[in-house]
């Protein structure tokens, strides 16, 4: 029905393109008029356009500076500050409107300017990544359309070879005229450096500065690169710099500017594939115990072996039953136990390809899944642990707990989580415990829960490592380290680690050194990082299938740009085989046939293991070929360049799909172009489309086909009953192949099912991170305020005013002046003891005022004694150090909360709602602690003597060594980056500061004289 409407009224994309056409015509007319200008006149035209945009923005920028200066006044009243902030917000909105209007009016001239510049650069020789290049690019009309779409903050889908990199220069140049900085985001450092050097001639012609952020750069160099008009870099580098800026000790250490406009290359890879895991900066946990996995590893290995033996007996039982009764329910139950016990068992996977077996397992499973899987325990109870391969979860059964208990000579209860709610209620309801004893008992319950939950978590992670993660598939082992392989690109993700102890579990399994445990110092999801940009756009060859997610999460529309020349590639239906062995044999035969013909072939694989299997089979046939996978990626550019030559055979994991064009060699067009042979379907349709897109660039011929077997991961986990039943009905023999559009569509439906599941995972992650994101905004805003303000005196006094009200109310009812005195002395080092009579209801405000005045006077005396620059350091240190420490502690608590929150579902509670409530409670507590400790430090910090400075310096050096070990990681996979010390650098060596609790008047003087403080150094205090 939708296709009929599109034929009559035109598709959304057709309408989008139609609206842009008049602007394209105008651009071409202006560009034609520019051809008569000299190079110098063309440069002057560019300068004039820049001045026109800047002249409209400068007055507003000046107003913003003047208002910001007023906020710096330490004596400003809160009401005046609120009014100025409101004016700044209104001015910001006006600034954005004026910017958008100025750029919209300049767009035709700027795009024409860039096009004419490209025309003049034709034939120009320059270096890109050490190789000689000749500029041969001038934007086509379809590329101008792509540029307009990007400028409007949308995603352009452009086919491979259509020149997306050149397209980006158009909106980048236009938006760079504002002087606010434009970020171009790529998927790796190589592409960031390459694209910067490749496109630089266009920008350099007009004096625009271009920078690039690379993994190895120091902060000073990064800052210079961010100050450029255009900055290239990876999503990880931009994200980690944002987190590090919010851990900086001084304004000078911060490297980034505001987030104005970003264009994300390969936007589906960055905003979707990478979005399932957050960016994390972590540091080592002091005194962490890394032996916990080694301790339980022998038990788990024994447990896994016992499960394998149990599964083998189930397979034998099933085979016996099936000989007499092909559809026997007990045989189906035995096979279902195999699926739940060892889903990757090769014998079981082979059995699934036999007629009727897959359907029998599916129907048996459906029977036990009825009524919310209430009967599934009957299947699992016979196993030691149950595996849900789709969900990636493992549950220890009662039988497994008893087995571990026997192995470890420990009580079975040690492998069970206590019912905290019931036990706490029992303690609360007991009359035999005093209040102090109840607190002690409850602490013991919480401790028991924490110990057992950590033990069970470690067991679960080791079981996952042995049951769900296979070497040379999900990861490889190189140089004694476990390295994750990106499922979408096939590349090794250097420096990335699986989260929640899973990586350590795999290290224990592989007998390599177990890396130290880490704790989160700062974190943000890819989604929430990119949602900070005022304007965001993206480009890719494959976005349409994910259009709904782009809009729902990022509010980004997708526009499909027509190709410059029609795509003539032939995309054939899938070829379906029963077993992997049959499929691999067919792949090798097809490759042999194509090589003899002289037609180049690219064989796409989904894992390192498959690429190596096919390579061995081709070597056995003496077929010369290249392999490109996570283990052999050092020749990537060279291998890709050769892949389109006559008779070339290239086996590649998904890594050959990004940022590379395969150009056809001489005589290859006549042979049919590049032949794409997919060895299996990926779980994402986008990855398959990327593989197909390697062929047929710029009107070149090409062919593509996928070879699929029923043993493939996708078919085994998500293949529909319809496909299975069709295969069974046809009853084809070994080696037979099925080719039908219905099968291809069924496979695509299975892929859609996986995509929807992955979308729900990403969306759920975002829902959880949105809670933390709001808290992060509050904390980072407070921290930046503390970092950027010269004086924080007024903020300290605001905190003091609130403190006085709260602390006086606390002791109002009991009129306990002594307790009030003790607390104020302990927290502020201020002596204050009101008379009992002053505590009546009418004078509570008066007591608070008197306390404020006493503390205020103390602070003023301190200001007179301490040099002003040191006082500023004290205030800044008090604010920043407390925020940093408390925020780290808060993140650790949030991590713990997040790990256990899903257990609330067993109590018929919504985990997300529970998480929001608990996280809010923790955040309120965090703010209260930050305010109190900041105030306390500001009052109690005093300069120290030179003798004491030495000890402080030693401690700071130790701290600096610790912070050097901070790791920036894209969780479950981002690169290890060294980090500058986040110890505040404002403490000069000759006069550092420390937290120093002022002695009481009757305490012994700390100088060691033996006299009371009031009779010794206390006499010198005002």
Swiss-Prot record:
It is an enzyme of class 7 (translocase). It is a peripheral membrane protein. InterPro entries: Helicase_ATP-bd, Helicase_C-like, P-loop_NTPase, SEC_C_motif, SecA, SecA_CS, SecA_DEAD, SecA_motor_DEAD. GO terms for molecular function: ATP binding; metal ion binding; protein-exporting ATPase activity. May bind 1 zinc ion per subunit. Signal peptide: none annotated. Its cofactor is Zn(2+). Its main location: membrane. Its EC number is 7.4.2.8. One of its GO terms (cellular component) is plasma membrane. GO terms for biological process: intracellular protein transmembrane transport; protein import; protein targeting; protein transport by the Sec complex. Residues 973-1001 are annotated as: Disordered. It catalyses: ATP + H2O + cellular proteinSide 1 = ADP + phosphate + cellular proteinSide 2. Keywords: ATP-binding, Cell inner membrane, Cell membrane, Cytoplasm, Membrane, Metal-binding, Nucleotide-binding, Protein transport, Translocase, Translocation, Transport, Zinc. It comes from the Bacteria. Belongs to the SecA family. PANTHER family: CHLOROPLAST PROTEIN-TRANSPORTING ATPASE, SECA INNER MEMBRANE COMPONENT OF SEC PROTEIN SECRETION SYSTEM. Part of the Sec protein translocase complex. Interacts with the SecYEG preprotein conducting channel. Has a central role in coupling the hydrolysis of ATP to the transfer of proteins into and across the cell membrane, serving as an ATP-driven molecular motor driving the stepwise translocation of polypeptide chains across the membrane. This is Protein translocase subunit SecA. The lineage of its organism: Bacteria, Pseudomonadati, Chlorobiota, Chlorobiia, Chlorobiales. The gene is secA.
């Amino acid at each position: 029905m939708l296709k009929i409407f599109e034929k009559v009224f035109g598709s959304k994309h057709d309408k989008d393109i139609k609206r842009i056409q008049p602007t394209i015509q105008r651009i071409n007319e202006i560009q034609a008029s520019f051809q008569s200008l000299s190079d110098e006149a063309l440069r002057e035209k560019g300068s004039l356009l820049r001045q026109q945009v800047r002249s409209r923005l400068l007055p507003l920028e000046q107003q913003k500076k003047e208002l910001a200066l007023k906020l710096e006044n330490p004596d400003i009243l809160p009401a005046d500050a609120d009014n100025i902030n409101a004016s700044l917000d209104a001015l910001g909105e006006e600034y954005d409107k004026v910017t958008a209007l100025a750029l919209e009016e300049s767009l035709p001239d700027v795009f024409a300017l860039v096009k004419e510049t490209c025309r003049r650069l034709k034939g120009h020789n320059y270096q890109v990544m050490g190789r000689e290049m000749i500029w041969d690019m001038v934007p086509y009309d379809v590329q101008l359309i792509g540029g307009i779409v990007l400028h409007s903050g949308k995603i352009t889908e452009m086919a491979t070879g259509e020149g997306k990199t050149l397209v980006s220069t158009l909106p980048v140049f236009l938006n760079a005229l504002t002087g606010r900085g434009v970020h171009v985001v790529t998927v790796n450092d190589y592409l960031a450096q390459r694209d910067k050097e490749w496109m630089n001639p266009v920008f350099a012609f007009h004096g625009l500065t271009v920078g690039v952020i690379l993994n190895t750069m120091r902060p000073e160099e990064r800052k210079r690169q961010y100050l450029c008009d255009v900055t290239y870099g990876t999503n990880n580098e931009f994200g980690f710099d944002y987190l590090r800026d919010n851990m900086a000790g001084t304004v000078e250490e911060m490297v980034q500017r505001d987030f104005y406009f970003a264009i994300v290359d390969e936007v589906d890879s960055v905003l979707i594939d990478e979005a399932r895991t957050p960016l994390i900066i972590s540091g080592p946990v002091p005194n962490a115990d890394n032996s916990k996995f080694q301790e339980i590893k022998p038990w788990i290995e024994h447990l896994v072996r016992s499960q394998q033996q149990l599964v083998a007996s189930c397979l034998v039982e099933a085979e016996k039953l099936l000989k007499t009764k092909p559809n026997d329910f007990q045989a189906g139950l035995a096979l279902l136990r195999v699926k739940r016990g060892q889903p990757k068992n090769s014998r079981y996977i082979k059995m699934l390809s036999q007629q009727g077996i897959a359907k029998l397992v599916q129907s048996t499973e459906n029977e036990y899944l009825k009524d919310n899987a209430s009967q599934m325990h009957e299947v699992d109870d016979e196993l030691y642990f149950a595996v849900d391969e789709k969900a990636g979860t493992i549950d220890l059964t009662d039988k497994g707990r008893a087995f571990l208990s026997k192995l470890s000579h420990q009580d079975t209860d040690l492998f069970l989580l206590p019912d905290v709610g019931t036990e706490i209620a029992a303690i609360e309801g007991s009359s035999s415990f005093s209040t102090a004893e109840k607190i002690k008992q409850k602490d013991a319950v919480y401790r028991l829960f924490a110990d057992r939950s950590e033990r069970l978590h470690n067991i679960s992670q080791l079981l996952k490592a042995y049951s769900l993660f296979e070497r040379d598939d999900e990861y490889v082992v190189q140089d004694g380290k476990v390295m994750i392989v990106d499922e979408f690109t096939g590349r090794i993700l250097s420096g990335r680690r699986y989260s929640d102890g899973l990586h350590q579990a795999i290290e224990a399994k592989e007998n390599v050194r177990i890396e130290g445990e880490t704790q989160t110092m700062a974190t943000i999801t890819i989604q929430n990082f990119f949602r900070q940009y005022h304007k965001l756009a993206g480009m890719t060859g494959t976005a349409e299938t994910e259009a709904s997610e782009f809009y729902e999460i990022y509010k980004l529309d997708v526009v499909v740009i027509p190709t410059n020349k029609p795509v003539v590639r032939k995309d054939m239906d899938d070829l379906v085989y029963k077993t992997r062995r049959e499929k691999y044999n067919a792949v090798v035969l097809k490759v042999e046939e194509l090589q003899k013909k002289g037609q180049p072939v690219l064989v796409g694989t989904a894992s390192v293991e498959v690429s190596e299997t096919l390579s061995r089979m081709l070597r056995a046939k003496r077929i010369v070929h290249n392999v490109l996978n996570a283990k052999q990626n050092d020749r990537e550019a060279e291998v890709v360049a050769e892949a389109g030559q006559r008779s070339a055979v290239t086996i590649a994991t998904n890594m050959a799909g990004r940022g590379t064009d395969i150009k056809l060699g001489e005589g290859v067009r006549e042979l049919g172009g590049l032949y794409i042979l997919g060895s299996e379907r990926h779980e994402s349709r986008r990855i398959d489309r990327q593989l197909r897109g390697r062929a047929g660039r710029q009107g070149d011929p090409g062919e593509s086909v996928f070879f699929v077997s029923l043993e493939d991961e996708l078919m085994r986990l998500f293949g529909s009953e319809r496909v299975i039943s069709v295969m069974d009905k046809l009853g084809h023999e070994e080696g037979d192949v099925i080719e039908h559009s219905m099968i291809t569509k069924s496979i695509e439906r299975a892929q859609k099912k996986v995509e929807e599941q992955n979308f729900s995972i990403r969306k759920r992650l975002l829902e959880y991170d949105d809670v933390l994101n709001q808290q992060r905004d509050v904390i980072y805003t407070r921290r930046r305020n503390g970092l950027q303000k010269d004086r924080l005196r007024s903020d300290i006094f605001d905190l003091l005013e609130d403190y006085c009200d709260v602390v006086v109310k606390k002791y109002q009812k009991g009129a306990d002046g002594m307790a009030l005195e003790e607390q104020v002395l302990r927290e502020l080092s201020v002596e204050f003891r009101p008379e009992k009579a002053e505590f009546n209801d009418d004078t509570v405000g008066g007591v608070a005022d008197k306390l404020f005045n006493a503390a205020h006077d103390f602070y003023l005396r301190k200001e007179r004694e301490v040099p002003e620059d040191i006082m500023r350091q004290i205030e800044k240190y008090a604010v920043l150090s407390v925020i940093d420490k408390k925020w780290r502690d808060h993140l650790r608590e949030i991590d713990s909360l997040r790990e256990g929150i899903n257990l609330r579902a067993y109590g018929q509670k919504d985990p997300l709602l529970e998480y929001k409530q608990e996280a809010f409670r923790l955040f309120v507590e965090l703010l209260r602690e930050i305010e109190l400790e900041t105030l306390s430090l500001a009052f109690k910090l005093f300069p120290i003597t030179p003798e004491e400075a030495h000890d402080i310096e030693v401690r700071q050096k130790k701290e600096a060594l610790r912070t050097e070990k901070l790791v920036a990681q894209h969780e479950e996979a981002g690169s290890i980056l060294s980090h500058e010390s986040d110890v505040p650098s404002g403490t000069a060596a000759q006069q550092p500061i420390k937290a120093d609790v002022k002695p009481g008047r009757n305490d012994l003087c700390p100088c060691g004289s033996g006299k009371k403080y009031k009779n010794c150094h206390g006499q010198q205090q005002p």
